[in-house]
Amino acid sequence: MKYSIAFGALAQVASAHYFFDTTIVNGAASRSNEYIRASTRAVAYNPIKFSSNPPADIRDNSMFDKGDGICNQGAFTNAGKTKVLEIAAGEELTVKLGVGAKMEHPGPGLAYMSRAPDDDVVSYDGTGDWFKIYQEGTCGSGDFTKDAWCTWGKDHLSAKIPAGTPSGEYLVRFEHIGVHRSHVNQPEHYVSCVQVKVTNGGNGKPGPLVKFPAAYSDKDPYANFSIYNGAKDFPFPGPEVWDGASSGSSSESEAPAPVSSAATSAPTSAAPSNNGSDIEPAGNTEQEAPSTDGECGVEYVYV
């Protein structure tokens, strides 16, 4: 009984902060961190912030722009302990949150891929080129500070490996960004990387290409975005989603994605409908931003 109570409390806390630790392909779920690199953080569910944020709001000394934005703090040190998941091009890959948590911060879901040099993903630190395969923002006319976001209340993110992806070994980087404090330049990044071997691949040329952590900046529009003054299109960070075709442009610097709230993925993936994402959500008049200091504010305290 004590264990159940403690686990339930942890799940509540982790719905405010969370981490991905399980993969699902064709209905088959993995063990915790079987294919996802575990971080070495003292508290696994804490977010990753920019180094420019107040020191009191940076947890575990983890900073996006200091390398932790690639696959999370210390994740590469666990690469050798992590298996490589075989998945065919065109199949869907799902990552699920640990400890029964759900995403209860407003914000987008995204996924990227990066091919490992010499197709040796276990030895790859993720400092190479990345291309985006999925992003989604808002999905309906709910509360723009909560359930208008496609990811709200979910315990997973899913993305299809584009059919044109060449066979080989890759890191697949999944990310949820909490934007409830972006209005004070404090977006929260929740990042995990899956080690995969793509089979039955195509002859596509992925792109646009970016590098992490340089693909994002604390000066970017998404990092200074307010959800509290009415619904609006969200400026996704990073490049456009690769369409899975035979060509894709390359970039050494950040290639901003179009300003949009619609779900986007390669054609092999069924994108959720964007029901009125540009329309002011019903009953969602302009709201004042929380004045509470600290990482998440009073409205995001769950225990």
Language-model features: locations:
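Beta-strand-rich extracellular modules
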Residues: E175-V179
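Peripheral, solvent-exposed domain-edge segments
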Residues: K2-G109, M113-H156, H180-V303
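A short tyrosine-centered beta-strand micro-motif
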Residues: Y170-F174
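Surface-exposed loop/turn positions
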Residues: E91, G168-E169
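A glycine-anchored, Pro-Gly-centered beta-turn/N-cap motif
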Residues: I161, P166-G168
